Every structure is written in structure tokens, then in C-alpha cells.
Amino acid sequence: MKKLLCAASFGIALAFSVGAQAADKIAVVNVGEIFQQLPAREAVVKQLENEFKNRASELQRMETDLQSKIQKLQRDGSTMKSSERTNLEKEVMAKREEFAKKAQAFEQDHRRREMEERNKILSRIQDAIKVVAGKEGYDVVIDANAVAYSVSGKNITTSVLKQVK
């Protein structure tokens, strides 16, 4: 009898807990759309272009210089003295390695800075989502890309976009 009473009370408690979970207010937000529509994103792109402009032009200059030396080697290599040809080949190899190192460092630095700025913007979006969810009384907010179906009335993307701007 005691076991039956315990099992029945456990079943009732389980039924009520499922009902309580269903009462959560859930909203959907499209973070990617907000990110694309922010004016701050375009400002960051221009800022990064200005920040890396000098290094990019230096890499272009190095590439042009390297290409001219390679063309000279291909064009005049057969008529050069062997010592001149060897020196030019060594110079081309050294410049090619230097260019590759600088290009790789440039790409890594650019990617790192891009991620830093992207994370700042995403942090602002996350803060705005928390504010809007708190104002409108939502318990759970899910990214629209992770949802197969949602009711359009539960989409808070425009409210979050207004909050971020």
C-alpha cells in the first residue's frame, strides 16, 4: 500500500512538473539578420581596412617586386652568368619566403582583429536580447537558425535590432 501511494504521488508530481515547464514563454531571434543590419558592422569593416591598409600595400609591393624578379629570371636566366643566376635564384627564394611569412602573419592578425570586433558586436546583441526578453517576459530565447518552426508573433528580432541601435 505504501509503495502504491508513493508511486501515485510521484506520478502526480511528475505530471505537474511537465505542466510547469510548458508554461515557459519562448521567443525566437535571428542573430545573423541583426548582425548584418547593424551600421556598426560596416564601421568596423572600414576601421579594419584603415588599420591594415599599410601592411596590405606593403605586401602588394613585395609581391610586385617578387614577380618582376621571377620574370627577369625566366627571361634572362639562360643568358646570365651562372653566378648571377644563382644569386638571383637565392634572392627570389629568400623574397618568396619573406613574403609568405609576412602574408601569413597579416592574415592571422587580420582574422584575429576581425574576430575581436565581431565578438564585441555579438556581445552587444546578446545584451540587447536579455533586455528585450526581460521587458517582454520571455523565459527562453532561441536563435532562429536552430528552430524548425515558430509562430511569427514570438519573433523578437525587430525589437532586439531597435534595442541594439
Swiss-Prot record:
The protein's location, in the record's own words, is: Periplasm
Query: Where does the record place the region Lipopolysaccharide binding?
Result: 102-113
Alphabetized UniProt keyword annotations: Chaperone, Periplasm, Signal
Disulfide bond residue pairs: none
Which Pfam families has this protein been placed in? OmpH (PF03938)
What start and end residues bound the annotated signal peptide?
1-22
Q: Which domain of life is it from?
A: Bacteria
Q: How does it assemble?
A: Homotrimer.
**What is the recorded name of this protein?**
Chaperone protein Skp
Look up and give the organism this protein is from. Photorhabdus laumondii subsp. laumondii (strain DSM 15139 / CIP 105565 / TT01)
Organismal lineage: Bacteria, Pseudomonadati, Pseudomonadota, Gammaproteobacteria, Enterobacterales
